[in-house]
Amino acid sequence: MAYLSVAMRYSIVQGSRQSFYNAYSGACRIFCLAFHQGKEPQIYEDGNQIRDFVNIHDVVDANLLVLEDDRANYEMFNVGGGAPITVKHFAETVAEVFGIQDYKPKPCGKYRFGDTRHIWSDISKLESLGWKPTRTIYDSVSEYKEWLNSASSIDNIIEYCSKKMEELNVLRDVS
């Protein structure tokens, strides 16, 4: 007996309900928490890393499509945002969502061990089924900010997560 299956490879998923407490959960959490607390976000490496962010609602839409479309049977699909950007540009977008004018990202002199320099997913195969991402980076950050504003007890999260990454030797000085 054969079982129908589909494999989905997700790029960097963003949106509300992304953990505040996961020290390694990414740029949206790090930058939003920093701006929310009136601090400068940490920009690792030189900020020119490329990332392919995708909104959680677009991921849900992609999953529903492959569940319902027989052309997806036994196939593998990349699920990405379709518009890769640099970490610096992402930080500028977060600053814009938070109403911060003239923000210029400054690298902090550290890097996260194990981070990939550039991440970009080829979504053309999924697009051939009629799917395309419809939410922008701005949409994802705005949604996360709204969820962040409804949270409580997050005052020391940035320090906690940075310390945790240093303890695990994940956060290191650039040499």
PLM region descriptions:
Residues 1-17, 42:
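Conserved beta-loop-beta element that borders a ligand/cofactor-binding pocket
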Residues 2, 20, 133-136:
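Short, surface-exposed helix-loop/turn micro-motifs enriched in polar/charged residues
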Residues 7, 33-175:
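C-terminal substrate-binding subdomain of Rossmann-fold SDR/epimerase-dehydratase oxidoreductases
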Residues 16-19, 125:
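Short beta-loop-alpha junction of Rossmann-like oxidoreductase domains
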Residues 19, 23, 46:
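Active-site "substrate specificity/gating" loop of NAD(P)-dependent dehydrogenases
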